């Protein structure tokens, strides 16, 4: 599919099957993928903009591939992307990311996001909801799984986890993903978990809340405190870690076994936020399969929220994901992969400026764009 001198990411997508009839193909699939990625990196947000960008940058694109029939129309781009097998596309993305990262992520944050304007009321189609895996330290999207209609994140998260290399990583998930089956999937994959515990597990939550409210001295809790402040807000976080968990009741069906496989520690964070003369307090509890020291626990939980600012916010503000109106076929799911690919490449680019400015620079400077897409993997 790819040619000598073409961007190396294309080699990882070479196994993609072209959904079109071979006798009717005017624009090769690798040319379409290269156009989609380059234009998205350079600032194009929809198929019309991608087509316009391609028409104005044909000489640049021909540095890598022939483009003998010029640039496809935006309708052709839309039809092809909507028809590509999303499962195979995801597998290609995962293979590419595995080559891109240089080490095992310490923390992998799992969280979901809805593309708000991808719904189609006329056809009764709900907005696209995608669960993504984010390497908090490397700031890389590791993978994604589309949540099926009439389903939820609980069914999508295990599918995503089984696609990932989890050995040696800590997986963090909010309360929606605090499920026994998900914990088991992480353990079986060689990883460890830090799962948020809320009232959706009422008996477990009540027991943990009761013990942490008046902990026995025998528990030998570890504690640390952090203070942050900005824009008139001061937040004090008191972290507590308990490595002794045999006081937590077991699964009644299997006496002596914890409800959550591999449970080794329980943590609590009490946050106190001062703003405008008022004070708000909140307590959050976490189930952990690894006996983290309290400072590591504090850092891991804090890093989980990097997926909100580092991924979801960037997709909405830099890539205008919430404004995208793509609705047909597999288009929304496949475009999410294109944006994640563009975002990963931009995240690795230098100099270190905002992704918004890196994206603008790629649109203005073809040599800079070439360096980005030629990132070896």
What are these regions, as identified by a protein language model?
Residues 1-23, 73, 84-87, 91, ...:
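Charged, often Cys/His-bearing segments associated with DNA-binding zinc-finger transcription factors
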Residues 8, 15, 22-173, 178-181:
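Conserved, well-structured functional cores that handle cations and Mg-NTP chemistry
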Residues 16, 57, 314-377:
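A short, flexible helix-boundary coil/loop motif
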Residues 22-32, 276-278, 326-334:
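Structural motif
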Residues 50, 287, 291-326:
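Short amphipathic alpha-helical "interface-anchor" segments enriched in bulky aromatics
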Residues 86, 98, 162, 191, ...:
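Generic secondary-structure signature for well-ordered alpha-helical cores
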Residues 134, 142-232:
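Nuclease catalytic cores that cleave nucleic-acid phosphodiester bonds
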Residues 198-303:
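An anionic, glycine-rich sequence signature occurring as long contiguous blocks
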């Amino acid at each position: 599919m790819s040619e000598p001198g073409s961007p190396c990411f294309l080699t990882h997508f070479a196994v993609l099957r072209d959904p079109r009839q071979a006798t009717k193909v005017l624009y090769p699939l690798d040319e379409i993928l290269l156009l989609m990625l380059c234009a998205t990196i350079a600032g194009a947000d929809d198929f019309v903009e991608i087509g316009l960008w391609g028409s104005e940058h044909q000489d640049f694109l021909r540095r890598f591939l022939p483009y003998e029939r010029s640039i496809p129309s935006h309708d052709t781009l839309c039809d092809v992307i909507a028809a590509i097998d999303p499962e195979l596309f995801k597998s290609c993305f995962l293979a590419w990311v595995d080559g891109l990262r240089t080490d095992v992520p310490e923390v992998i944050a799992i969280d979901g996001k809805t593309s708000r304007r991808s719904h189609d009321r006329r056809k009764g189609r709900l907005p696209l909801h995608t669960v993504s895996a984010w390497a908090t330290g490397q700031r890389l999207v590791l993978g994604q799984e589309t949540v099926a209609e009439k389903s939820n994140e609980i069914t999508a998260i295990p599918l995503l986890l089984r696609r990932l290399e989890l050995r040696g990583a800590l997986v963090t998930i909010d309360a929606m993903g605090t499920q026994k089956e998900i914990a088991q999937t992480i353990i079986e994959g060689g990883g460890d978990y830090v799962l948020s515990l809320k009232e959706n597990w009422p008996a477990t939550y009540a027991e943990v809340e009761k013990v942490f409210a008046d902990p026995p001295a025998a528990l030998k809790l570890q504690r640390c405190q952090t203070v942050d402040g900005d824009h008139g807000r001061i937040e004090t976080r008191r972290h507590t870690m308990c490595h002794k968990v045999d006081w937590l009741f077991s699964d009644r069906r299997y006496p002596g076994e914890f409800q959550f496989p591999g449970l080794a520690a329980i943590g609590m964070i009490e946050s106190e936020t001062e703003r405008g003369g008022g004070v708000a307090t909140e307590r959050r509890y976490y189930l952990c399969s690894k006996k983290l020291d309290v400072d590591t626990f504090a850092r891991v939980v804090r890093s989980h929220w990097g997926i909100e600012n580092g991924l979801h916010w960037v997709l909405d503000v830099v890539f205008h994901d919430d404004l995208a109106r793509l609705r047909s076929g597999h288009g929304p799911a496949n475009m999410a992969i294109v944006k994640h690919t563009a975002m990963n490449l931009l995240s690795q680019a230098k100099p270190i400026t905002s992704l918004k400015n890196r994206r603008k620079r790629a649109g203005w400077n073809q040599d800079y764009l070439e360096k980005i897409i030629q990132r070896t993997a």
